[in-house]
Regions:
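Residue-level recognition of oxygen-bearing side chains
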Residues: 45, 179, 212
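Basic, Lys/Arg-enriched C-terminal extension of HTH/homeodomain DNA-binding domains
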Residues: 196-246
Length: 246
């Protein structure tokens, strides 16, 4: 089955699975027309391969919010790269990352080969027809600016939904960085009431049981060195190593 042969030349495909991620999150790629395929595990190896394989498509195992700084580097250097992040589950912050980077898409591991092939076709054509300038500018933000932008998008999107009054107040405080204990004090209620409001919101957005709501909707600025332009490490969320998502 060669679903892309009529419209696109054979792909160069990079299967990227950073240490700590589960390669079982990769989707079935048997229906893609692939000229070359390589599996990589380090950010340095990925960036070097993209240098040698311009126009290659990347399928990455794991959620994009846990690798935010890596994708920032990828789109800064190679703004037309198409990246698919594959996982069994995604959090609200991941949706915000997808909305920020034009050529990054979220896919579920169980996605059919036909749907994946069609998505790849559309994404690659889109990357070829759009100017790389916008992606370069978005990727040139400092780390704090990038994290603040992603968190702001999450805040606006989630608070625009029709939420119960208590849930909206709890969410707003948690997104502002308040702990559950501080949130309870500011609302004049008990920690259990805050916890119950959290559970309601987690069910609404399919957030796994073991992942705190604050970690699912907010990225923390990582501890990086002064030369952040060279930083390609991970932006940590508390859910980054949650077994529920692997």
């Amino acid at each position: 089955m060669q679903t892309l042969t009529r419209v696109l030349p054979p792909l160069r495909l990079i299967m990227f699975c950073q240490s700590g991620e589960n390669p079982a999150q990769f989707p079935d790629t048997g229906g893609l027309c692939v000229e070359d395929c390589v599996r990589l595990r380090t950010p340095e190896g990925l960036l070097d391969r993209l240098r040698r394989w311009p126009g290659a498509m990347v399928i990455s195992a794991g959620r994009p919010s846990t690798q935010l700084l890596l994708w920032q580097q990828v789109f800064l250097r190679y703004p037309r790269t198409v990246v698919f992040c594959s996982s069994n589950a995604f959090l609200p912050v991941d949706v915000s990352v997808e909305g920020y980077f034009r050529h990054l898409r979220l896919i579920k591991r169980a996605m059919s080969v036909r749907v994946l092939a069609r998505m790849a076709e559309l994404a690659i054509w889109s990357s070829l027809q759009t100017s790389p300038y916008e992606e370069e500018m978005k990727s040139a933000l400092s780390v704090p600016e990038l994290v603040m932008e992603i968190n702001s998008r999450t805040l606006v999107r989630l608070l625009s939904e029709r939420l119960p009054k208590q849930g909206r107040r709890v969410l707003g405080l948690l997104l502002s960085g308040c702990s559950p204990e501080m949130t309870a004090r500011m609302l004049g209620t008990g920690v259990r009431q805050v916890w119950l409001a959290e559970q309601t919101l987690k069910q609404r957005w399919d957030i796994p049981t073991g992942v705190p709501l604050s970690d699912a909707v907010r990225i923390r600025i990582p501890d990086v060195g002064p030369d952040i332009s060279q930083q390609s490490g991970l932006v940590k969320t508390g859910a980054g190593n949650a077994p529920d998502l692997c």
